Amino acid sequence: MAIILGIDPGSRITGYGVIRQTGRQLTYLGSGCIRTSVTDLPSRLKLIYAGVSEIITQFQPEYFAIEQVFMAKNADSALKLGQARGAAIVAAVNQDLPVFEYAARQVKQTVVGIGSAEKSQVQHMVRTLLKLPANPQADAADALAIAITHCHLSQNVTRLGEGNLNLARGRLR
């Protein structure tokens, strides 16, 4: 059994989703958005850090999964997104959580089956996979999709990591 916190970072709205994985079964534990209404970026980053820290304290996840930065046409937006990611990652690292990153295309491919899926398709599949009564908010759905992706891909990541570790020690299995 493992609890996974997924984060969809944003400088104004950061989505979060928490699920429990027991074998192949996924259980919804909670989701929502950290909304920053203040105008200056440092204050928004502080709110993101505090919000993610509070969520970690509340749910006690074992794993932290976050969306990777993508290349944006607007450099200023990309920088702000990177800073929001940094605030969330520092909150996780401060509580000794391992951090995993997934590209948006990889998340959509894993959850919907199409790397170019629309937000509404992600929301629908998250609702279906977690047996929710309604579609979650878009940012929360993205965060839940990131957590689901971690569940599906983490076994491969672990196996690859162990294989590299064993090879580095000169042992083969």
From Swiss-Prot:
InterPro entries per record: RNaseH-like_sf, RNaseH_sf, X-over_junc_endoDNase_Mg_BS, X-over_junc_endoDNase_RuvC
UniProt EC number: 3.1.21.10
Details of cofactor binding: Binds 2 Mg(2+) ion per subunit.
Protein name: Crossover junction endodeoxyribonuclease RuvC
Segments passing through the bilayer: none
Keywords associated with the record: Cytoplasm, DNA damage, DNA recombination, DNA repair, DNA-binding, Endonuclease, Hydrolase, Magnesium, Metal-binding, Nuclease
Family: Belongs to the RuvC family.
Known partners and oligomeric status: Homodimer which binds Holliday junction (HJ) DNA. The HJ becomes 2-fold symmetrical on binding to RuvC with unstacked arms; it has a different conformation from HJ DNA in complex with RuvA. In the full resolvosome a probable DNA-RuvA(4)-RuvB(12)-RuvC(2) complex forms which resolves the HJ.
Subcellular location: Cytoplasm
Natural source organism: Erwinia tasmaniensis (strain DSM 17950 / CFBP 7177 / CIP 109463 / NCPPB 4357 / Et1/99)
Cofactor(s) of this protein: Mg(2+)
Enzyme class: hydrolase
Active site annotation, chain numbering: 8, 67, 139
PANTHER family in UniProt: CROSSOVER JUNCTION ENDODEOXYRIBONUCLEASE RUVC
One Gene Ontology biological process: DNA recombination
Coiled coil: none
Catalytic activity: Endonucleolytic cleavage at a junction such as a reciprocal single-stranded crossover between two homologous DNA duplexes (Holliday junction)
GO molecular function list: crossover junction DNA endonuclease activity; DNA binding; magnesium ion binding
Binding site for Mg(2+) 2: 67
Keyword Transcription applies: no
A Pfam family this chain is assigned to: RuvC
Designated gene of the protein: ruvC
CDD domains according to UniProt: RuvC
Residues that coordinate or bind Mg(2+) 1: 8, 139
Function description: The RuvA-RuvB-RuvC complex processes Holliday junction (HJ) DNA during genetic recombination and DNA repair. Endonuclease that resolves HJ intermediates. Cleaves cruciform DNA by making single-stranded nicks across the HJ at symmetrical positions within the homologous arms, yielding a 5'-phosphate and a 3'-hydroxyl group; requires a central core of homology in the junction. The consensus cleavage sequence is 5'-(A/T)TT(C/G)-3'. Cleavage occurs on the 3'-side of the TT dinucleotide at the point of strand exchange.
